[in-house]
Amino acid sequence: MTKTALITGASSGIGRGIAHKFGQEGWEITLVARREKNLKNVAKEVEELGGKVHVFATDLTEKESPGNAVKFAIEKMGKVGTLVNNAGMGRFEMVPDIKDESYQEQFQLNVWACMATVRSIAPHFKKNGGGQIVNIGSIVGYLGISKGSIYSSTKWALRGLNESWREELYSDNIKVCYVGPGFVLTEFNGRKEGGTPEEQEWAMVPGDVAHAVYCVATQGPNSDIKEISIQVLDRS
């Protein structure tokens, strides 16, 4: 197992939590996100936790950005062992109010950027005898929600890509896993990062998802985790 990882969408939320977990475990990681200031803050946190970190600020929806991010990670780390496709966004509107721009933005980042990043890194994984891809989806990749038809459909699409990539890349020892978390206390969900103590009684925090991702990244050579669905514990 190569303890190096490329993590997208790492400037806050689940991506930040994943970066923290890998840093705590002593990995060398490359963090990618659009907001450079936030990204550098996360990098500092990771270093304080014991990880080695590189930062690449870019908008992954731009044509050349996914390939450039992969190239940067390879140049800095020499060999990438794990890709965590976490970058994503959501807009929540009733169907009569959906704008074309909203549809395009969500599919461009949540689907196209993930595909383009995998497309760029797959030859590197193949050359090095294998690798691990973790695609961060959502519980809404299994169901539909009111006002979330576009966001939900991007996560269904990502699951479809995940299934196809598993078939395509299996013979090259490249493992692919979809992680679909339920409600997590992040700014994406309109919450203060990590939530309040009261909120933590009923919802997940980024570290919960990070733990699952790390389990996938460190699985044994003879196991292949296909999919993880993480739901909030029902205490009723």
PLM features: residue spans?
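Active-site helix of classical SDR
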Residues: 118, 154
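Conserved glycine-rich cofactor-binding loop
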Residues: 11-13
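The beta1-alpha1 cofactor-binding region of Rossmann-like NAD(H)/NADP(H)-dependent oxidoreductases
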Residues: 37, 57-68, 100
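Substrate-binding pocket helix/loop in short-chain dehydrogenase/reductase
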Residues: 94-95, 99-104
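Conserved glycine-rich Rossmann-like NAD(P)H-binding loop of the short-chain dehydrogenase/reductase
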Residues: 25-41
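Residue(s) in the substrate-gating loop at a strand-loop-helix junction
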Residues: 138
